[in-house]
Design a protein with these regions (language model features):
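C-terminal catalytic lobe of FAD-dependent flavoproteins
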Residues: 1-11, 22-153, 160-171, 189
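Intrinsic disorder at enzyme termini
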Residues: 108, 130-138, 212-231
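Short cysteine clusters
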Residues: 155-157, 192, 197
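Short helix-coil junctions and helix-kink-helix linkers
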Residues: 184-188
Length: 231
């Protein structure tokens, strides 16, 4: 896949890279000096330097040697549909890929004699979340009067309130980690990368889910930040 891009996020941050470096270990998501230098070189015209970088990360793309998408039912496992090898056009192709998967699924259900119908109360859209920092001063004051949690700034870098974090926790798909809260609300996404707000987010998440702080994960399962001290 191609590498070496420079794009601006809706929030105003720049994303640099990737390097598109091939690795042999599928678990290797490390960053190295060579890759970071290459990513920085992709955005020299924007005057971005090392001092401006607040986080570096890497991922591994499971590309196919045929350089093509794999969208098909499994020949081994019943009920499994492969959607793999999705590369650069994946975002643009997502609606069409979803339709292909739907057609494969319906075809397989038909073969098995299974019936189906559209869910009557299906809601394809989720309510738009309130972004406190984008509201006018009058709207902010009104919201704080209705719910004082919106008057408590948890993440100072991104101006994220306790109310927004609780809204995210109260969503149909419940975030269960600090990283999930960051992705939903941007708390911890700023310059300090959670250095200030992480302990508060951890506490809010633990209280909302009636868990101990030592049970809250940072990212995936069993990545808890705190550990109980055994006497």
């Amino acid at each position: 896949s191609k590498g070496g891009g420079c794009c601006k996020t809706p929030e105003g941050n720049y994303l640099l890279g990737p390097s598109a470096k091939e690795v042999w270990n599928k678990e290797d998501t490390s960053c190295d000096a060579e890759g970071i230098a290459y990513a920085l070189s992709c955005c020299q015209h924007k005057g971005v330097g090392e001092k401006d970088v607040i986080r570096s990360f890497a991922g591994v793309r499971a590309a196919d040697f045929k350089e093509d998408f794999i969208i098909e039912k499994s020949e081994v496992t019943a009920g499994l549909i492969h959607v793999a090898g999705i590369q650069s056009p994946g975002l643009s192709a997502a609606p069409a890929i979803a339709k292909m998967v739907e057609n494969i699924l319906l075809e397989e259900m038909k073969k098995e004699g299974m019936s189906y119908k559209r869910k009557e109360n299906y809601q394809p859209y989720r309510p738009k979340r309130r972004v406190f920092r984008k509201l006018s001063l009058e709207e902010q004051n009104k919201l704080i009067k209705e719910n004082p949690d919106y008057g408590q700034i948890v993440c100072r870098c991104e101006f994220i309130t306790k109310g927004e974090i609780l809204d995210a926790i109260d969503s149909p798909v419940v975030p269960t980690s600090v990283d999930a809260i960051k992705r939903r609300t941007r708390a911890g996404m700023g310059r300090c990368q959670g250095g200030f707000c992480l302990p508060v987010v951890l506490q809010i998440l633990a209280q909302a889910q009636q868990q101990d702080c030592t049970e809250i994960d940072f990212t995936a399962k069993d990545t808890n930040i705190l550990e109980k001290i055994k006497n």
